[in-house]
């Protein structure tokens, strides 16, 4: 972004400077070549929860835009949604898991008594299923009782991971839209359903009103060319994509996959890829409805029987008759190309999905492992278990290695038991876990301890995610994980020991979205912003600088506190940022302005990442950029946030020669004049810098005045009563 330009996190606008890059990445191996063509985007600042919709005469739309059009509410006749629009959505289904009870408490706390549509809601218990404490069992019982009392579909602990159930049981269907209060809702895109994460407050709003708000992200098109070599899987593809395009190319985008390479991908591989588009930084990962997907649903229909309420002949015939496809000429912000034929078994880490190596390369480094994991909504499906079983057949897990296996659902486990794969894994020395999330979220048996190295077929390897912060975690396919468990170190499966290491090529060429630019150019943002009663016209304080990019939600609010529903505001304030900097609490005070780097708040959907900051008395966070989920949590919980990359760069320059501090009191002061839409920063030597930013409109202000989305919903309910 050009110096001095910025935008408000609730708005997407300002010109993104043209970028042409030709580079090589020596660390990126396995003969992969990648091309990306990135379009220059211009968005106009829209300050409220609604904006003017595209008024063109049937403009070409992407698959994402078409699905949103189908589920958007109160759109004027003959108006077509597009990327950048704020819309009110009424998703077909909304899933929540162990956080269902906090959602229920929010729901009841806002004065709601009966859910708007009990056929819209799904409750599953999957995260902490190994925890048999009285408190957890009581919470699980509360969730079950609430669901049954409201007539909500409920799946108990042991039935499986919610995302897998959503797919198995047809809550996520082609051409539909489903959301969940979990960051891996992207998974549903593997079956052509637009899946995107929401947070707990959004879920409570949907329970009460059937609706919430969403801004359609910029949309990226990923062309998968070539055929995937035999022995590789979707995990190798998504790990490779995360490593090849590791400069936030698709951050906060909706992704659509297409290309000849789709024919070589099973539906389970597509689900794996869609699942980990979350770690790639995207808000959704959507595959098209094609013949392979329709054939998969025919098999599901045979398995489930003719009378299933969602997967039935009538539904499938309707999908076949009118599949939702992208229009010719639909605009995509980015075009990425990946040649599948050049891939080999891939490994990400340690402790980052952006660090890539081929398994063959790491094998030469003799990286000994202590634990291996085949679990999660990423790779706990039947084909994953089969790949691992084939790899370990007739062999034994290495001495000193613990190999944990858990199916994504009870249906998957039963099928693996029936075909013998489950017993094969047990015979090799694997330790089985109940169907659920477990070690992937850092809960239950088998967590990584200080100094240990683990390799996992899960989706997230943030430091401390799967146990100790002093452990190292790598991610890979089930075949690589199983082979490594047998070898006692990270290795490539048989047949890939001599994978050739070549340099990838990346070519980025920006384009201009003329359709958006022409619309945007007619809309001015120079007028003063009206301030509603109760909203401050000035927000000011001293800047505290946490100089880190990709500061994730585990760093802001540790996962071990996420499911403690009884934690107080004061306790939240004490643990805020402790995984990032244990000194944060001592260095900050009420009314400070927190400034951090780029992609702030990446990671899980836990809204405590926002509420913990508020608990410390910090009213405003400024970042180079924000994770979209954190942006939602900010809006929904009345934490102010401004995206101002130029300020971040100026702070980095100013303190470049000083000793490193994770949390720095700068002596700089920031003042946001909401009425004039300006931010002024005064340095410690009284130099001033100012930026014009986008307006914060009355609709968003009203959320803050009501204390967030929850308060707004409560107000709406009281009006209807």
UniProtKB/Swiss-Prot annotation:
Enzyme category, top tier: lyase
InterPro entries tied to this protein: Acnase/IPM_dHydase_lsu_aba_1/3 (IPR015931), Acoase/IPM_deHydtase_lsu_aba (IPR001030), Aconitase/3IPM_dehydase_swvl (IPR015928), Aconitase_4Fe-4S_BS (IPR018136), Aconitase_4Fe-4S_dom (IPR036008), AconitaseA/IPMdHydase_ssu_swvl (IPR000573), Homoaconitase_mito (IPR004418), Homoaconitase_swivel (IPR039386)
Superkingdom field: Eukaryota
PROSITE patterns hit by this protein: ACONITASE_1, ACONITASE_2
Cofactor requirement: [4Fe-4S] cluster
Major subcellular location class: mitochondrion
Catalytic activity field: (2R,3S)-homoisocitrate = cis-homoaconitate + H2O
Sites where the protein binds [4Fe-4S] cluster: 377, 437, 440
Pathway the protein takes part in: Amino-acid biosynthesis; L-lysine biosynthesis via AAA pathway; L-alpha-aminoadipate from 2-oxoglutarate: step 3/5
Cellular localisation: Mitochondrion
Assigned GO CC terms: mitochondrial matrix; mitochondrion
Keywords recorded for this protein, A-Z: Amino-acid biosynthesis, Iron, Iron-sulfur, Lyase, Lysine biosynthesis, Metal-binding, Mitochondrion, Transit peptide
Annotated EC: 4.2.1.36
GO biological process, one term: lysine biosynthetic process via aminoadipic acid
Note describing how the cofactor binds: Binds 1 [4Fe-4S] cluster per subunit.
Cell membrane found in the keyword field: no
One Pfam family it belongs to: Aconitase_C
Similarity remark: Belongs to the aconitase/IPM isomerase family.
PANTHER family xref list: HOMOACONITASE, MITOCHONDRIAL, HOMOACONITASE, MITOCHONDRIAL-RELATED
Its biological purpose: Catalyzes the reversible hydration of cis-homoaconitate to (2R,3S)-homoisocitrate, a step in the alpha-aminoadipate pathway for lysine biosynthesis.
Annotated protein name in UniProt: Homoaconitase, mitochondrial
Name of the encoding gene: lys2
């Amino acid at each position: 972004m050009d110096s001095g330009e910025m935008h408000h996190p609730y708005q997407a606008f300002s010109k993104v400077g043209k970028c042409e890059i030709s580079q090589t990445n020596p660390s990126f191996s396995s003969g992969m070549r990648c091309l990306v063509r990135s379009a220059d985007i211009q968005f106009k600042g829209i300050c409220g929860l609604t904006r003017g919709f595209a008024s063109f005469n049937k403009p070409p739309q992407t698959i994402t835009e078409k699905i949103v059009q189908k589920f958007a509410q109160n759109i004027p006749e003959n108006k077509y949604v597009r990327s950048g629009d704020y819309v009110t959505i009424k998703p077909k289904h909304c899933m929540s898991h162990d956080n269902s009870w906090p959602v229920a408490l929010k729901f009841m706390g806002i004065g709601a008594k009966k859910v708007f549509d009990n056929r819209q809601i799904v409750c599953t218990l999957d995260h902490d299923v190994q925890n048999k404490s009285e408190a957890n069992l009581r919470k699980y019982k509360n969730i079950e009782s609430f669901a049954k009392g409201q007539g909500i579909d409920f799946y108990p602990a042991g039935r499986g991971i919610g995302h897998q159930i959503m797919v198995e049981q047809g809550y996520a269907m082609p051409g539909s839209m489903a959301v969940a209060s979990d960051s891996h809702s992207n998974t549903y895109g593997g079956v052509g359903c637009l899946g995107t994460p929401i947070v707990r407050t959004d879920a409570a709003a949907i329970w009460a009103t059937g609706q919430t708000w969403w801004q359609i992200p910029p949309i990226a098109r990923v062309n998968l060319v070539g055929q995937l070599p035999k022995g590789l899987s979707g995990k190798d593809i998504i790990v490779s994509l995360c490593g090849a395009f590791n400069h936030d190319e698709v951050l906060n985008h909706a992704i659509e996959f297409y290309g000849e390479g789709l024919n070589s991908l099973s539906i389970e591989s597509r689900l794996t890829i869609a699942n980990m588009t979350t770690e790639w930084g995207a808000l959704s990962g959507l595959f098209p409805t094609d013949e392979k997907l329709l054939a998969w649903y025919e098999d599901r229909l045979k398995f489930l029987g003719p009378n299933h309420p969602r997967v039935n002949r009538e539904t499938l015939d309707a999908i076949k008759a009118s599949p939702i496809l992208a229009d010719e000429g639909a605009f995509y912000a980015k075009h990425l190309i990946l040649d599948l034929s050049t891939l080999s078994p891939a490994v990400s880490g340690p402790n980052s999905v952006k660090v890539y190596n081929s398994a063959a390369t790491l094998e030469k480094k003799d990286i000994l492992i202590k634990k291996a994991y085949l679990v999660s909504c990423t790779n706990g499906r039947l084909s994953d278990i089969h790949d691992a079983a084939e790899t370990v057949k007739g062999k034994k897990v290495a001495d000193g290695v613990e190999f944990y296996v858990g199916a994504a659902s009870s249906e998957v486990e039963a099928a693996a038991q029936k075909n013998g794969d489950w017993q094969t894994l047990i015979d090799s020395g694997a330790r089985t876990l109940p169907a659920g999330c477990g070690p992937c979220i850092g809960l239950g048996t088998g967590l990584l301890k200080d100094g240990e190295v683990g390799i996992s077929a899960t989706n997230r390897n943030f430091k401390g995610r799967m146990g100790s912060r002093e452990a190292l975690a790598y991610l890979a396919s089930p075949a690589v994980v199983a082979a490594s468990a047998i070898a006692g170190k990270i290795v490539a499966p048989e047949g890939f020991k001599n994978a050739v290491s070549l340099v990838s090529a990346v070519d980025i060429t920006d384009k201009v979205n003329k359709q958006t630019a022409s619309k945007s150019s007619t809309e001015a943002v120079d007028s003063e912003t009206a301030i509603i009663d109760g909203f401050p016209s000035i927000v000011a304080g001293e800047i505290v600088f946490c100089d880190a990019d990709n500061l994730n939600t585990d760093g802001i609010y540790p996962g071990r506190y996420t499911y403690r529903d009884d934690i107080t505001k004061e306790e939240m304030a004490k643990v805020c940022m402790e995984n990032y900097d244990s000194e944060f609490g001592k260095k900050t005070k009420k009314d400070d302005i927190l400034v951090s780097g780029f992609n702030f708040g990446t990671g899980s959907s836990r809204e405590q990442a926002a509420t913990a900051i508020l608990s410390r008395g910090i009213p405003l966070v400024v970042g180079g950029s924000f994770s979209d989920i954190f942006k939602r949590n900010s809006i929904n919980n009345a934490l102010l946030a401004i995206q101002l990359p130029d300020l971040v760069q100026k702070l980095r320059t100013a303190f470049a020669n000083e000793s490193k501090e994770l949390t720095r009191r700068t002596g700089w002061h920031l003042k946001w004049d909401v009425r004039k839409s300006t931010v002024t920063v005064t340095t410690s030597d009284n130099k001033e810098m100012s930026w014009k930013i986008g307006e914060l409109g009355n609709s968003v202000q009203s959320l803050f005045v009501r204390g967030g989305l929850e308060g707004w919903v409560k107000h709406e309910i009281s009006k209807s009563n």
